[in-house]
Amino acid sequence: MGMRMMFTLFLLVVLTTTVVSYPSDSASDGRDDEAKDERSDMYELKRNGRCCHPACGKHFNCGR
């Protein structure tokens, strides 16, 4: 393959992955909400003096 053909193939792959991944961003809104809920649960456990998340588990008892 020549350089021009390889460059064209590279652009085709990049554009295809960009177009394919763009619509899937709208589906992640629900997953983001779930992640926010998990974070709020972590902070609630932290306020109660226990936390099993690695970010705060070293400072608090896991409570298991």
Swiss-Prot record:
Main subcellular location of this protein, as a coarse class = secreted
Where is this gene product found? Answer: Secreted
GO MF terms held by the record: acetylcholine receptor inhibitor activity; ion channel regulator activity; toxin activity
Q: Where in the sequence is the signal peptide annotated?
A: 1-21
Q: Which UniProt keywords apply?
A: Acetylcholine receptor inhibiting toxin, Amidation, Cleavage on pair of basic residues, Disulfide bond, Ion channel impairing toxin, Neurotoxin, Postsynaptic neurotoxin, Secreted, Signal, Toxin
Please explain the role this protein plays, according to its UniProt record: Alpha-conotoxins act on postsynaptic membranes, they bind to the nicotinic acetylcholine receptors (nAChR) and thus inhibit them.
Name this polypeptide is given: Alpha-conotoxin-like Ac1.1a
